[in-house]
Amino acid sequence: MFRNFIYAIFSFLLLVFSVTQSSCQGKKDPVPEVPGNKAAVKVGAWYFGGWSFPADQNGHTFHISPTLTTTFSDREPVWGWREDKAGVMTEQINYAADNGLSFWGFCWYDNTLVDDAKTMDNLNNALDLFLKAPNKNRLDFCLMSCFPVSPVNWEKICDRTVPYFKEGNYLKVEGKPVMVFFNTDEVISGMNGIANTKAALQLYRKKAREAGAGEILIGARTATRPSDPTYQNKYVECGFDFLTTYNNADDGRSNAGANDYSRLLEGDKKSWNGISAHSALPFVPVVGTGYDMRPWALDHPNQPASDFWYTGMTPQKIAEQLRAGMQWVKANPKKVPGNLLFLYAWNENGEGAWLTPTKSEGAARLNAIKQVIQDENK
C-alpha cells in the first residue's frame, strides 16, 4: 500500500514504546448493532490529498513524479495534476456530486511525530480547500487517520479531529459522525496494547460528547486473514464500531506483474465475504477501480512497492464492479452501517485507481457509475 510511501517521505523520529497487547480471549464487550440501514446505498470514495506539495523547477513533487507525468500521462485529470489551483476543488465537488457520489473519505495526517510538520500538513491541504469551497455541501465527508499514533499525540488527534464532526456536511450514520483509522494495528501497538487502545477510544468518545458532537462511530481499516479467521476479534476488544478496507488489491493478486481487472473483483468479493463472515462487527465494503503503482515505484525505487498491477479497466467494467458492490450491500443490510460503500478511489491516480475525469478519457468513468447508482437505488 502506498501509505508506506507516505511514512517514508519524511525523516521523523518515533518514540519507542513497548508493545504489551492483552489477550483476545475471555468475555468480549457487547458488539454494537448495525445502525442506519436505509433502502438506498450511499456511495462515496476515498480522497488522497497528495497533489498540492511545493513543486521543483520542473513542476514535480514526490507524487507528481516524472514517470507519472510522462509514461502514465493518461491518468492526468482534466484540471491538471495539482488540486490547489483556483477553482479545482469546486470543479471536483461538482463532478462527484453530479455523478451520484454522496461523500468523500479524506486521508488525514497528524503532524506530531514527524520532523517537518509543515511538509506533513500539505497532505491535509485538500481537506482545507474542500471546507472552503462554496459548494462543499453538495458532498458529505469523513476522515481516515493515516499516520502512526502513540500516547504522545493521541489527545492532539482527538482535539484536532472532533471539531470536524460538527460540520454540517460531516458524514453521519443515525446522527453519529464516522471516523476511520487506516493503520489500526499500529494504533494498537502505538498505544501499548488492546486495553490502552480501548481506553484511548473511550477518551475520544468522551471528548466528542463534551464538544457537542455526540456519539461517534469509529472504524478500523483491516484486511482478510484466511489463515486466522479470528484475527478481527481484537478490534472488538478495543471497542471499534465497524470494519472496512482501503483497497483489496492484494486479495485479487494471482501473480507478479499484470493481473486482469476481473481478478480485482474477485479480491473485492473475498474481502466483503471473508471479513464480514468472521467478525461480529459491522462492515463497510470497498470497490476497487484499479491498482497500478508502477509510476511511483519506478521514480522512488528505494521505497516499498507492490510487485503486481491490474490491467483492462474500462468505465463499463468499473461500473459493473460497483454494481456488484451495491448489490452486496443490499443483500447484507444487517452487516453494513448506513448502507455505506467506498470506492477506491477518487484520486489515487499515482496508485492506478481514480474516478477523476482525465484528459485522455474525459468523464467516462463517472458517467458509467452514475447510471449504476441510479439503477441500483431506484
Predicted segments, located by residue:
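Positively charged n-region of N-terminal signal peptides that target proteins for export
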Residues: 1-5
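Bacterial Sec-dependent N-terminal signal peptides
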Residues: 19-35
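Glycan-processing catalytic domains of CAZymes
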Residues: 30-378
